[in-house]
Design a protein with these regions (language model features):
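Aromatic-capped interface at the extracytoplasmic side
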Residues: 1-15, 194-200
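Structural signature of transmembrane alpha-helix termini at the membrane-water interface
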Residues: 2-3, 76, 164
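Short, solvent-exposed beta-edge and connector elements
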Residues: 9, 14-36, 41-42, 46, ...
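Short beta-strands and strand-coil junctions in structured, solvent-facing domains, enriched
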Residues: 18-20, 54-55, 198-199
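N-terminal or membrane-proximal amphipathic helix/coiled-coil initiation segments that transition from
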Residues: 28-109, 116, 123
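Long, charged amphipathic alpha-helices with heptad-repeat/coiled-coil character
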Residues: 82, 86-89, 93-204
Length: 204
């Protein structure tokens, strides 16, 4: 006998002897395909549990997986300084693609603008240094001024290098996390999909 709500164990009575059926996950009985006294073949689907919760879990994990995958693709493009190209599997979610594309261009533009400002400052100091070196030769400026400008120029070059390095370090760290999320969520989806498949209860 199978109750209206199955908590994991039910019984059917074939023509030969009683068999015990078990569901690893349990749940609410949605459909019952056999009656007491019916002959049941091996591996025959005899009942199905309500898939609502399991389908919701699979859908939730799939959405997180797609988001992590899109982020991973963007970050790989940032780290390798290559065009952003999304896999075909994400083409059905244009909002997700648009969001990551906007973020990709925004981050690249911000880096480019910061580099531009830094290079302008470097150019100005380099020009001032050249003029000052000429004045030193004519005795109109002190060597101390040259040394000060050389230190300033070195500091600006170091800041430019740090700016670029930090951008790629951050991107690589985020990429590693996104890649790990993609892998772990793929396993979660696989497990939850298996749970969904087990909602169909079969005879032994």
């Amino acid at each position: 006998k199978l109750d209206e709500v199955s908590t994991g164990t039910g019984k059917v009575i074939p023509s030969l002897h009683e068999q015990v059926l078990q569901s690893l996950d349990g749940g609410i009985l949605a459909e019952l395909y056999v009656r007491e006294g019916m002959q049941v073949k091996a591996d025959q689907v005899v009942a199905r549990l309500d898939p609502t919760i399991s389908e919701s879990n699979v859908g939730e994990s799939s959405a997180k997986y797609r988001a992590a995958l899109a982020e991973s693709v963007r970050l790989h493009a940032e780290v390798t300084n290559t065009p952003l190209v999304f896999p075909q599997s994400l083409k059905l979610w244009p909002d997700l693609i648009n969001s990551e594309t906007l973020l990709y261009h925004s981050r690249r533009d911000q880096l480019t603008e910061s580099e531009k400002e830094m290079n302008q400052s470097i150019g100005l100091v380099r020009r001032e240094l050249g003029i000052t070196e000429g004045l030193v030769k004519s005795g109109a400026a002190s060597i101390v001024d040259v040394l000060r400008l050389q230190r300033q120029l070195a500091d600006l070059n170091l800041k430019l290098t740090d700016l670029q390095t930090q951008y790629y370090v951050d991107a690589r760290q985020q990429m590693a996390k996104a890649d790990a999320d993609v892998q772990s969520l793929a396993e979660v989806i696989k497990g939850r999909a298996d749970t969904l498949d087990r909602l169909s209860i079969k005879s032994p």
